[in-house]
Design a protein with these regions (language model features):
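Axial heme c-ligation environment in periplasmic c-type cytochrome domains
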Residues: 34, 43-54, 67-96
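Sequence/structural segment immediately N-terminal to covalent heme-attachment motifs in c-type
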Residues: 21-38
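Generic structural signal for beta-strand residues in well-ordered domains
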Residues: 13-15, 25, 40, 74
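Classic N-terminal secretory signal peptides
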Residues: 2-21
Length: 103
């Protein structure tokens, strides 16, 4: 029984790690990483800083998904974030949820 439990935990960890990599790939293919980095500020804020700022807020996922699709200005400084209408609504939600895990 112990071996089965350990195996299940290990498989879950690998699956979750794979999801994180898939979401990072989505961030790259969507153009997010042209201006953002996970850990450090580039043109835009670090994704982990965004995740930390909005963590625990009721509408954080929907709010961030909206910013991903529609862009924003005067939120993180003078450089506006351009809209990214090419990102589908469902992918914007996946990206927002991914960012919220990076606190």
């Amino acid at each position: 029984m112990k071996k089965v439990l350990i195996g299940a935990v290990a498989a879950s960890a690998l699956l979750l790690n794979g999801v994180a990599f898939a979401n990072a790939d989505l961030a790259k293919s969507s153009g997010c990483l042209n201006c953002h980095n996970v850990d450090t500020k580039l043109v835009g804020p670090a994704l982990k800083d965004i995740g930390a700022k909005y963590a625990g807020k009721d509408d954080a996922s929907a709010y961030l998904a909206g910013k991903i699709k529609n862009g924003s200005k005067d939120v993180w400084g003078p450089i506006p974030m351009p809209p990214n209408a090419a990102v589908r609504d469902d992918n914007a939600k996946v990206l927002a949820d991914f960012i919220l895990t990076l606190k």
